[in-house]
Amino acid sequence: CDSRQFFKEMTIGTAVPESKELAAAIHYFIQNRSVFDSYNVGEFERDALEKLEVLFKENPIQIMVGGSGLYVDAVLNGLDYFPEVDPKIREALLLKIEKEGIEVLQKQLKELDLETYKLIAIDNPHRIMRALEVCIGSGIPYSTFKNKPKKQRNFNNIKIGLNADREIIYNRINQRVDAMIDNGLIEEAKTLYAHKELNALQTVGYRELFSFFDGNFTKEFAISEIKKNSRRFAKRQLTWFKRDKNTLWFDYLTDKLTIASEVSEKINKLKE
């Protein structure tokens, strides 16, 4: 459940599972789309629920893995209702970001809706503009619309999270970025550079390299920015997932059998 691993042109930058990992278990929604396709969280919710309906007939236990919190929430709890917004608001925000930069919009969102500011990927201009246009158009914080009753699904879920000390997470991120560069991320980004305005490419790892290609960053600075923004994104991911008090958290070094045992216990309780 990774909102960027859908796209087949973004293999290296999204750390798509290796072929042996994909062969170990059947995967869905991995590189099944093109960056040129229009695909949003609502469409994913629909497609995932349709796929689950089929898969549950084969096995009552299915596993969803990934770090895109909004997409996970869409499948488990349904999407929130948001009011229609005057397109002129989006046009004004686009003009502002072009003239003054994303930092101005980040500051505005922080003032209008601190809760959303703390949770979303604030380096993603589309996410920032979406939250702001709702705040401005409705006169109500974007987060208010997200605090509605959850939709009822015809399945139960058990949520599991793996965590580690911040220093370990950040070191892993730095190593992962270095590995991506060694594996050809710069070359992959070059093949997508002509289409850098696409929503799918407003992504850490590509956005910084596009600035390098534009001549705004040196190669070394672009790589350091990828690391910094990846660390920032990881911090926000943890903030997002830790909102849910029902998640079972384990240290990343916890023995697999221990995790399996606790999960099995939870499953058995659901059967009672």
Task: Briefly describe each language-model feature range.
Residues C1-E272:
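Phosphate/pyrophosphate-binding catalytic cores of soluble transferases and nucleic-acid-acting enzymes
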